[in-house]
Amino acid sequence: MNILITGADGFVGKNLKEYLENNKENIIFSPTLEELDLTDSDSAKNYFNNNNIEYVIHSATTESKNKIYPKDVCEKNLKMFCNILKYKDKDTYLINLGSGSEYSRPNWIPQMKEEYFDKYIPQDGHSYSKYLISKIINLSKDKTLINLRIFGIFGKFEDYTNKYISNCIAKNLIGLPIKINQNVIYDYLYIKDFCKIVEHFIKNKPVNNTMNVTPTDSIDLISINDYIQLTLKIKPKIDIIKEGYGREYTGDNTILLKNLRNYKFTPIKESIDELISYYKENMGLIDRDKLLEDNFLEYAKKIN
């Protein structure tokens, strides 16, 4: 299978590339920006004309800095998607990586179902672009277009300075205090599960073209840190700025499970154990000064 992964140098794309390459029947295309600039129509046209692509996994997005996207994020994200749509072969499947932010952050409710989509329109540029792409896929009725709506996702290769679970593990490993703005309940999907889900939809055509990609069990931020500290044999301690709970970020996965045929997710504790082992084996990746800046906490203060 000839598979193009856009954004293959990012957290999700890098994991997908590593996972799918294990199947020797797959030929993975992971071009650099110089080889393929999806915001440039000529670049996209030439790439698709010169390469036989059977599947596109679109994980590329406009890069953010400390969780802040540039002003033209919506324009760039739409250009990338539209250029893929225009220049891919009509029989080439496109698996687009969507986001729970399509439901509009200020209006999130627990266990959002797919039919909740379009009740509200997202206000920020990144979420709005994801919303519009999802809308295009839904309205197209094209069976080659698939939108996988991701909520929380974690695993190796993610940015430990602003991704909660890796941030928590890294700080605990080097003895830094854990401080959160407010407790929140999340759907955290392990990257290994996501890779298996994508592989399933390459091998098996989905019944639904858009679905939430979330685990069955949700978890709150305090419980995650408690488990990490218990595993590392650290006295449980976490500082919380605001009492109560922030806005829950969870989605209903009924449609996903119908398409996956009784898929069993990796238990959250098992996946955290694996990530702890990864950081223990790669302690050199952890930059104490970057963790002390605490960009993740500053971002959390702004959104909750």
Regions found by a protein language model. Give the residues of each.
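Conserved Rossmann-fold NAD(P)-dependent oxidoreductase catalytic core, especially the SDR/UDP-sugar
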Residues: 82-123
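NAD(P)H-binding glycine-rich loop region in Rossmannoid oxidoreductase-like domains
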Residues: 38-76
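N-terminal Rossmann NAD(P)H-binding glycine-rich loop of SDR-like oxidoreductase domains
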Residues: 2-21
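Mid/C-terminal beta-alpha module of Rossmann-like enzyme folds, strongest
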Residues: 168, 197, 204-244, 248, ...
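NAD(P)-dependent short-chain dehydrogenase/reductase
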Residues: 131, 135-186, 191-200, 227-231
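Amphipathic terminal alpha-helices
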Residues: 268-304
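NAD(P)-cofactor binding segment of oxidoreductase domains
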Residues: 54, 68-95
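Glycine-rich Rossmann NAD(P)(H)-binding loop
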Residues: 6, 153-157, 179-188, 210-219, ...
